[in-house]
Amino acid sequence: MALRVAGLFLKKELVAPATQQLRLLRTGNTTRSQFLANSPNTALDKSILQRYRNLETPANRVQATYLWIDGTGENIRLKDRVLDKVPSSVEDLPDWQYDGSSTYQAHGENSDTTLKPRAIYRDPFKPGKNDVIVLCDTYSADGKPTASNKRAAFQAAIDLISDQEPWFGIEQEYTLLDVDGRPFGWPENGFPAPQGPYYCGVGADRVYARDLVEAHVVACLYAGIDFAGTNAEVMPAQWEFQIGPAGIKACDDLWVSRYILQRIAEEYGVVVTFDPKPMEGQWNGAGAHTNFSTKEMRADGGIKAIEEAIEKLSKRHERHIKAYDPKEGKDNERRLVGRLETSSIDKFSWGVANRAVSVRVPRGVATAGKGYLEDRRPSSNCDPYAVCNAIVRTCLLNE
């Protein structure tokens, strides 16, 4: 469940008048050490594990971490197995079962749920050079996709329009918290200076946890993810990374990059939340802006196809809002409020270089007359399969 405790805890303070918020960031010398001391994970001596990772293991024995999306539609689960050969593709990987009654996906009397491997990545956490991360989708006892398996429907849509070469680039925003739910680096008995100096910022008073962010970049590149970049965001302790452009691989990559981020954060004793509005008041929310294009849009004169797609999106606004967060719009109600660089959840809008609209056309695209559109409505905790499936079915399949 997405963390909102920080927002609830500080709601009264953070809606105070701006004049009361103009105070210097106060961080005690012991804040970070106390912060980490409160995390059970950082209490463990990491050097002990390294002793065992230095042991030689049989070359033909491979550790495979199977990942899947649980019944919440936003959280990742995993379990490990050892394989007897090095897999070269997902076809070499066996299906597996797990207890779906413990992941909100089945009832106890018929709880065996099936994992089907769909994508394979190098594992930055395991010691073996052949160890892998296996992204799976999930199927109930009757063989049908579980309710949280949005990948199956998206794959079916992609199969129908693959000749149009759809690309997706996803901008994943997230917020770092301490284990008590307070944003990382925020003073214990107050709050930072108002937004302004933090976006793409530099300096110890403006940027927090850059080490964690840079570790995430390297781990994702090692894994084979199409990682495009990263930056500090508008709210302190908020960051963004970008995935793509690609087809369904962009969605696979986003889920695996979320997993890698959370695993690295475990080691730092930091909590990652993808909640779209973790802090109440005059603080930016978090989204997953989704950039979309087709072969026609990227060609000369593609702006016409872009505008046609926007027109189709304008007619299916309600459908997209329901698809753009795991609670069918309830999470985005807190974020899409018509201010703080968001549009209104109740009304579709678009414009060139405008960040207060539902769909933005970047100025460079408008100038070039070709490129892509940016759908700014998806929440940071969205399922990218659901988002991209809705876009494809509206814009390309005319559903």
Curated annotation (Swiss-Prot):
It comes from the Eukaryota. Belongs to the glutamine synthetase family. The gene is Gs1. GO terms for biological process: glutamine biosynthetic process; L-glutamine biosynthetic process; phagocytosis. PANTHER family: GLUTAMINE SYNTHETASE, GLUTAMINE SYNTHETASE 1, MITOCHONDRIAL. GO terms for cellular component: cytoplasm; mitochondrion. Gene3D superfamilies: Glutamine synthetase, N-terminal domain, Glutamine synthetase/guanido kinase, catalytic domain. Homooctamer. This is Glutamine synthetase 1, mitochondrial.
